[in-house]
Swiss-Prot record:
Signal peptide: none annotated. GO terms for molecular function: dimethylamine methyltransferase activity. It comes from Methanosarcina acetivorans (strain ATCC 35395 / DSM 2834 / JCM 12185 / C2A). This is Dimethylamine methyltransferase MtbB3. Pathway: One-carbon metabolism; methanogenesis from dimethylamine.
């Protein structure tokens, strides 16, 4: 009887497949992506590598030592304090506690602050509160801290916003009116996003994470790209990550262009150059999970798309790896076995520069991803490598080499807790445990500025207050 291996369906249900069936599923998933995106299939060796990862006997797997990458985040602390019947675990805690828990307990390389409603439009009335929260977090934290939110252009349509719902207009065959409504909404999205981030950057934010870009289609992406363009012009030092909502940009409008490229119908490898052109530092591509397909099919399909996006992108790629995307099952408590295998495959086969940790409970998302492929933040040198990706648009290899040279260590040492513990204390760039008298918060980041030869916005903000 042929040996069967434990895998998952796209909804998280456990299944058992033979090696031959796994390879067949991998081939089919890769072929699907190749056909849709008009891109190459995975090679035979890459398919075998994926099969090996999926058939590994351990519950949790991880990347080979030395291949670790920085992680970024979607939804911020909501996975801890949120309790809306999805992936939040409802722990009563402040956002400062949530951010510091990710930094000190989870070993995150970066973190983000976000509003409970997690869209830019609802932040407007409470932006002063968000600015105060950002200031307090920046005073206490060392890793890069973003402000994260969704463009969420749907909030600008009735009944929540001022413009007529294009869906209703299209049902009445008022196509031109629907397009006009989308264009107005995109203008407001750009304006609101820029206004909010002007306030947050003045309060010390390292940057912004646009989460689920193009959720409302091509006009949503158009408004976001223009916001990125404006922010980059105003704030050359701002860290900007643009993460997508889905694998393909839906053509709700159908005629909008950016840089003379029609946005409707773009796949990840076609999205990347435009996002870089607008001024983003990091691109977060997405590939959707099909809940009725196997994890072998879904992961192969996702890796095929992302590998091509990494190849086409002029900037680092942090693939979105929350529940329901990136080959990960659509389940609020993503299975550790599926998450760690997908994480490893994206690094070792697709060649991503980082992982954008998405929606899911704390164990299933940040803990699993960081154990599988993260650089463990200030336990080692993950925060330093992340800063070079964002401040200088360095790909993972270049960023590691740069930081290793500054520290006078080998790139393998950058994720070595023993090496980095002593070095961080010696250089006074912040350590994960409480050491009396050691530099913390702003002081540690000022030392990081000198070490890496970069500017850090929270330090600039602090210096301006002293003047």
């Amino acid at each position: 009887m042929a040996t069967e291996y434990a895998l998952r369906m796209g909804d998280g249900k456990r299944i058992y497949l033979t090696k031959e069936k796994i390879l067949s599923e991998i081939e089919a998933g890769s072929s699907n992506a190749a056909d849709l995106g008009d891109i190459p299939d995975l090679s035979t060796d890459e398919m075998k590598k994926l099969a090996e990862i999926l058939m590994m006997p351990g519950k949790a797997v991880s990347v080979e030592q030395g291949m670790e990458v920085p992680v970024t985040h979607d939804i911020g602390t909501i996975r801890l304090d949120g309790d809306q019947g999805n992936s939040g675990v409802g722990i009563p805690s402040s956002r400062l506690v949530g951010c510091m828990t990710h930094e000190r307990a989870f070993g995150a390389d970066t973190m983000e602050l976000g509003h409970i409603d997690y869209s830019f439009k609802p932040v407007k009335p409470v932006v002063s509160n968000e600015c105060q929260a950002m200031e307090v977090c920046q005073q206490n934290m060392i890793i890069p801290l973003f402000y994260g939110a969704m463009p969420n252009m749907g909030l600008y349509y009735t009944p929540d916003g001022p413009f007529e719902n294009p869906g209703d207009l299209m049902k009445m065959f008022k196509i031109d009116k629907a397009r006009e409504s989308m264009e107005h909404a995109a203008d407001h999205l750009t304006r609101d996003t820029v206004w909010v981030m002007q306030k947050l950057f003045a309060s010390g934010a390292d940057g912004v994470n646009f989460d689920t870009t193009a959720a409302a289609g091509d006009a949503d992406m158009y408004g976001t790209l223009r916001a990125v363009e404006v922010l980059r012009a105003q704030f050359p030092e701002m860290y900007i990550e643009v993460g997508m909502a889905g694998e393909m940009v839906l053509g709700m409008h159908g005629e909008l262009e950016y840089d003379e490229v029609r946005l409707a119908g773009l796949w990840p490898h076609e999205q990347a150059p435009l996002i870089a052109k607008a001024g983003a530092n990091v691109f977060g591509p997405v590939v959707n999970t099909n809940t009725s397909k196997t994890s072998a099919w879904n992961l192969a399909r996702a890796v095929t798309f992302i590998k091509e996006a990494v190849k086409a992108s002029p900037i680092p790629c942090h693939v979105n790896m929350g529940m329901g995307v990136g080959g990960i099952p659509m389940l609020e408590t993503p299975p550790v076995d599926a998450v760690t295998r997908a994480s490893k495959a994206m690094v070792e086969v697709a060649g991503v520069d980082g992982i954008o940790i998405g929606v899911g409970d704390p164990l299933g998302m940040p803990i699993s991803h960081i154990m599988a492929s993260g650089m463990t933040g200030i336990r080692a040198a993950g925060d330093l490598v992340a800063r070079m990706e964002f401040s200088k648009n360095m790909r993972i290899g270049e960023a590691k080499e740069y930081v290793a040279k500054k520290l006078n260590v080998d790139t393998m040492d950058l994720a070595d807790e023993h090496v980095m513990r002593e070095l961080r204390e010696e250089l006074d760039i912040g350590v994960i445990t409480s050491v009396p008298g050691a530099a913390k918060g702003i002081a540690a980041k000022m030392n990081i500025e000198k070490l890496l030869g970069i500017k850090i916005n929270s330090c600039e903000t602090f210096r301006a207050q002293l003047a």
